[in-house]
């Protein structure tokens, strides 16, 4: 391109011989907050394993169901609901909550499969997963006679 060509093009555009189109853009929307949810009306869910034999902890015996009810507001669409069990996992099982006894954990199951702690999963409010828990011990460990406790949080949230 010679030196005069860019100047000529600029002059043509300046006097209106070059044309273009423009349009205005308008953006709008509504910010919505997801409906509030509660699990068991905010009450603590307690699972008592009773007396557990130190030599009988095998990940099968003492299995218990976790009864819970999720209640959310009436307008749940189009929100995607997620459920998680949050707590400190044992060093030997990512699906087991650490108890007050170092070599003992409480494994969590969802629909009979191990439920990885601190990992949200998609659920449907009309058919939430069945949750179960069972005591498990670290392989090769010997459990001492002792009372044990463990704490986790069952969390339902919209994404």
Q: Which role fits each region the language model picked out?
A:
Residues 2-4, 21-159:
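Mature extracellular/passenger domains of Gram-negative fimbrial/pilin and adhesin proteins
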Residues 9-17:
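Bacterial N-terminal signal peptides
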